[in-house]
């Protein structure tokens, strides 16, 4: 990984832990250039990408597909049910096969944390791996689009007060963002049910009472309640959660006029956030979705630059 002539070069993108501040800022600025129509890009040769999603996805899956098409890549969509995965083939052997067929980039989402390690450490797999989310582990492209959205608003990260609220322990978005936001100089707070908080967050910020910190916040980043990762016997009340931990209309009145509201989506309206606030003037949720395409264009360009530099 490196930055040369203002352009980031990546071999793979699996975790925010692997990115430097210079690389992050380079990707943000390149994504902004794509968004403004000021980025020149042309493929030197035919390039193939395959999107392997083993968990449901709308935003990540389709924005990667659109980003790939905008860059001129040939896209091979992958249906696990129609593939040899349904016959018992492993993910490793599937990627080994795609690599042998000539696929250059595999974008993968899996419910298995760290699935990518055996792929990037293999001597026989040469295609680039982009992590589209691994269980409750990491979601680097979501983190980068979140950072782009924050940077568009404030032009900095240093000193910003940011709360990440909700289903923390099950959230790959929280874990990706907390690592990089702290490195970039933001001051982090975590809010939500105590049962969904763990000591791993202590090194990055402070567990806080939402009502006490709301008036100080620059960014309120909400997280989806991830029922699919909870124990089946865990009790949950939508109304109770919204009342005690959600961004209600009354709580939103406590925010500074300059504060912004974020959510990686999908949004559970009237659970994490009041329905009326999702598309409110302070919300940047739709902007996050749009920025996802440009951020992923920047990621893919960096991957291609890294392959070319080998």
UniProtKB/Swiss-Prot annotation:
Organism this protein belongs to: Lactococcus lactis subsp. cremoris (strain MG1363)
Keywords: Pyrimidine biosynthesis, Transferase
Signal peptide per UniProt: none
Keyword Transferase: yes
Protein name: Aspartate carbamoyltransferase catalytic subunit
Matches recorded under NCBIfam families: asp_carb_tr (TIGR00670), PRK00856.1 (NF002032)
GO function terms (MF aspect): amino acid binding; aspartate carbamoyltransferase activity
Binding locations of carbamoyl phosphate: 59-60, 109, 139, 142, 265-266
GO process annotations (BP): 'de novo' pyrimidine nucleobase biosynthetic process; 'de novo' UMP biosynthetic process; amino acid metabolic process
Record-stated family: Belongs to the aspartate/ornithine carbamoyltransferase superfamily. ATCase family.
Enzyme class: transferase
């Amino acid at each position: 990984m490196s930055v040369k002539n203002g352009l980031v070069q990546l071999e793979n993108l699996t975790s925010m832990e692997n990115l430097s501040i210079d690389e992050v800022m380079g990707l943000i600025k390149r994504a902004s250039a794509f968004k403004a129509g000021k980025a020149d890009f042309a493929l030197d040769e035919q390039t193939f990408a395959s999107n392997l999603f083993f968990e449901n996805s709308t935003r990540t899956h389709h924005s990667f597909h659109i980003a790939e098409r905008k860059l001129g890549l040939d896209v091979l969509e992958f249906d696990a049910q129609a593939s040899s995965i349904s016959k018992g083939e492993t993910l490793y052997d599937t990627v080994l096969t795609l690599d042998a067929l000539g696929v250059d980039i595999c974008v993968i989402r899996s419910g298995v944390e760290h699935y990518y390690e055996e792929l990037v450490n293999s001597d026989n797999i040469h295609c680039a791996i982009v992590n589209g989310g691994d269980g409750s582990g990491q979601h680097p492209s979501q983190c980068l689009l979140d950072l782009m959205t924050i940077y568009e608003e404030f032009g900095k990260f240093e000193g910003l007060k940011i709360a990440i609220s909700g289903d923390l322990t099950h959230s790959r978005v929280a874990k990706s963002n907390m690592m990089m936001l702290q490195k970039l100089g933001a001051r982090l707070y975590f809010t939500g049910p105590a049962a969904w908080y763990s000591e791993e967050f202590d090194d990055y910020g402070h567990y806080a009472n939402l009502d006490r910190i709301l008036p100080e916040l620059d960014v309120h980043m909400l997280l989806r309640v991830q029922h699919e990762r909870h124990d089946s016997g865990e009790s949950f009340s939508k109304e109770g959660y919204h009342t005690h931990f959600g961004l209600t209309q009354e709580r939103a009145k406590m925010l500074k006029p300059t504060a912004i509201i974020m959510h990686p989506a999908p949004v559970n309206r009237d659970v994490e956030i009041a329905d009326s606030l999702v598309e409110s003037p302070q919300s940047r949720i739709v902007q996050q979705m749009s920025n996802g395409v440009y951020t992923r264009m920047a990621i893919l360009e960096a991957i291609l630059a890294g392959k070319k530099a080998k």
